[in-house]
Swiss-Prot record:
<dbReference type="GO" id="GO:0005576">
    <property type="term" value="C:extracellular region"/>
</dbReference>
<keyword id="KW-0027">Amidation</keyword>
<comment type="similarity">
    <text>Belongs to the frog skin active peptide (FSAP) family. Tryptophillin subfamily.</text>
</comment>
<keyword id="KW-0964">Secreted</keyword>
<dbReference type="GO" id="GO:0006952">
    <property type="term" value="P:defense response"/>
</dbReference>
<protein>
    <recommendedName>
        <fullName>Tryptophyllin-T2-7</fullName>
    </recommendedName>
</protein>
<keyword id="KW-0878">Amphibian defense peptide</keyword>
<feature type="modified residue" description="Leucine amide">
    <location>
        <position position="6"/>
    </location>
</feature>
Length: 6
Protein backbone atom coordinates (compact mmCIF):
# COMPACT_ATOMS: atom_id res chain seq x y z
CA UNK A 1 0.00 0.00 0.00
CA UNK A 2 1.27 3.53 -0.74
CA UNK A 3 1.19 4.73 2.90
CA UNK A 4 3.20 1.62 4.00
CA UNK A 5 6.28 3.07 2.19
CA UNK A 6 7.09 5.24 5.25
Amino acid sequence: KPWERL
